């Protein structure tokens, strides 16, 4: 695994109580492509989410700054005291957390064998721009009138698993501030349309229990049995975040704590899952499916605008697959649609328009969004929303984490050759 050492030069100019040991991030080669000049290698790495890092009392490393109920109240009665008391340490062994890279390939593993026992690590990583060695930021992707392409191997993802690749409108700096000098270098700043309440928001103590909300574009949520792509837009204006990326929802209604999809963000979104939309023979394990998930394949997602420019309004999200050198057009579903549009969403996700529809999602894509990749399973719902019932062929119990751990302890996802750029510039096929 290629490694990149972050020397954390910031640590020489700010309190060492906030940044602890250095971070060693794995290199991941990615590519930016243009129609005129082809694809150019990018200087990028990945960083694990800050919550994976040790965050502890500066004077006693054995005391964590979080508990099972959130922040440690003795160390974090307010934001400033929390920042003074708590240290975030770097991670030097990414493989121990289920993350390995080799050139342009990223492998995420759900379980690790620790002293003969399986441990669930469920890593989530973000793409980091390493072009400035002194102050790393996330690589923000602006994808209006552009496409994003990657090769994926989901053959080791059974029912109940989710190997995800998606975009979050988090701050490129990771919310770096006087109270959070670590920033993107240590994986801070995460948010999404689910508005989860976590101990930290932008690397600062979440004293008031707010939810961390932002626009989210799920390019890829999948296992070997089912797949979907889903935009999740939010109703806040960018200036309401004060440049911090995260919108902090403060009330049960705004955060949609009841799960009724009537808060500040569209938690349900408008998804394109071929199985759920009536084409049950398109995606699955074996040569009887148009996309055979027992073998690797390439995924192309195009964000098309009304005028074909990066300043136009998003009108369509189109999907292509490439396998064995052949382009496979996206599934045609029972309605006759083969892409995600406002028209399709009006019939399948009536709430989507009230969150701004395609145009609302497009505004976030135009501003720039951060790439996240993860692997996880679902102890509460067994991932049935993705691959069971009307959404896929999996039965009601085979997605249980304990079943996966017993029968597929090696479960993993491999992402490779991440490329973004002009429409038609990121892939070649007959």
UniProtKB/Swiss-Prot annotation:
<keyword id="KW-0119">Carbohydrate metabolism</keyword>
<comment type="function">
    <text>Has endoglucanase activity on substrates containing beta-1,4 glycosidic bonds, like in carboxymethylcellulose (CMC), hydroxyethylcellulose (HEC) and beta-glucan. Involved in the degradation of complex natural cellulosic substrates.</text>
</comment>
<dbReference type="InterPro" id="IPR037019">
    <property type="entry name" value="Glyco_hydro_7_sf"/>
</dbReference>
<dbReference type="Pfam" id="PF00840">
    <property type="entry name" value="Glyco_hydro_7"/>
</dbReference>
<dbReference type="GO" id="GO:0008810">
    <property type="term" value="F:cellulase activity"/>
</dbReference>
<feature type="signal peptide">
    <location>
        <begin position="1"/>
        <end position="16"/>
    </location>
</feature>
<keyword id="KW-0964">Secreted</keyword>
<feature type="glycosylation site" description="N-linked (GlcNAc...) asparagine">
    <location>
        <position position="153"/>
    </location>
</feature>
<feature type="glycosylation site" description="N-linked (GlcNAc...) asparagine">
    <location>
        <position position="395"/>
    </location>
</feature>
<dbReference type="InterPro" id="IPR013320">
    <property type="entry name" value="ConA-like_dom_sf"/>
</dbReference>
<keyword id="KW-0732">Signal</keyword>
<dbReference type="GO" id="GO:0030245">
    <property type="term" value="P:cellulose catabolic process"/>
</dbReference>
<dbReference type="GO" id="GO:0009251">
    <property type="term" value="P:glucan catabolic process"/>
</dbReference>
<keyword id="KW-0325">Glycoprotein</keyword>
<feature type="active site" description="Nucleophile">
    <location>
        <position position="216"/>
    </location>
</feature>
<keyword id="KW-0326">Glycosidase</keyword>
<comment type="similarity">
    <text>Belongs to the glycosyl hydrolase 7 (cellulase C) family.</text>
</comment>
<keyword id="KW-0624">Polysaccharide degradation</keyword>
<dbReference type="InterPro" id="IPR001722">
    <property type="entry name" value="Glyco_hydro_7"/>
</dbReference>
<feature type="active site" description="Proton donor">
    <location>
        <position position="221"/>
    </location>
</feature>
<keyword id="KW-0136">Cellulose degradation</keyword>
<feature type="glycosylation site" description="N-linked (GlcNAc...) asparagine">
    <location>
        <position position="43"/>
    </location>
</feature>
<dbReference type="GO" id="GO:0005576">
    <property type="term" value="C:extracellular region"/>
</dbReference>
<protein>
    <recommendedName>
        <fullName>Endo-beta-1,4-glucanase celB</fullName>
        <ecNumber>3.2.1.4</ecNumber>
    </recommendedName>
</protein>
<keyword id="KW-0378">Hydrolase</keyword>
